[in-house]
């Protein structure tokens, strides 16, 4: 199971579970290429990605379960696209955890993986509706479609910490790790 520790832009450390890294993306290159506008939905890589989507979602869910962590809360990163949804749904089908994804929203289009967006831009683009239970979260899993800069995850954690999150282990699950 590919798993690594990563530092976020704010210096916070997370555990990252992923299917493939930059050197071995294969059809998961679709996730990077579609955001940058460099690929057509009818291209062979897009067709291959969609053909393998359910298999890849199941594999990522297997990796998450095999971490041995009993996640009590799960959040899907807010996005203008729905690429993380199949992975999130497959993982939620395997876990007994509270889903707080609907508490997050993205108010404006910000490409968090791009060098043109600052960490503050990403924090400002994401909103969070606190419910007062954040202080009791112990093992948080964040699901996204890819991990590049870590700005989205750092922004989500900023809002959760502001709402009372503390003493909580953070794991991020993505199909594609877009940096080495």
Where are the model-predicted features located?
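Structural alpha-beta junctions
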Residues: 70, 95-101, 161-171
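PRPP/pyrophosphate-binding module of the type I phosphoribosyltransferase fold
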Residues: 113-180
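Short glycine-rich phosphate-binding loop at a beta-alpha junction
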Residues: 69-80
